Amino acid sequence: NELCFQEKAQIVGCELSHVCEPDFDPEKPYEAMARRMVYHALNGSAIRRIEAGIRHAKETGADGVVWFGHWGCKHTLGAAQLAKRKFEEQGIPLLILDGDGCDRSHGGEGQTSTRLGAFLEMLNTETDENTDRQEESHDE
């Protein structure tokens, strides 16, 4: 898919790989593993996940965020609109994509590609407009 190989479109983070790394006593490895589970953003309320996502997006300088809603995951799907509102209040555009992360036969690849392409185009337009505004302010 051509969307995966665009220079201007890069994945800068994934909430599943962003884990809590608390200080721990090497003599208590099970306690350390338990802390990683308990304090991970996906363990807890939806607002905890949303706030962690906003923090990660800001830390990485992301231009936008894709919120993938796994079919059948009430936690993810139920929080999608709240996430959209919270991210956008922080100036971070968010695209909600629903799909089946386990079974590709459920399809939707064409629609997903179209929606992702439109989102990337919108982000590119916003970036270009911001660059133009910055150049205009420097010219004055």
Task: Mark where each language-model region is.
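An N-terminal assembly and electron-transfer interface module characteristic of large anaerobic redox
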Residues: 1-140
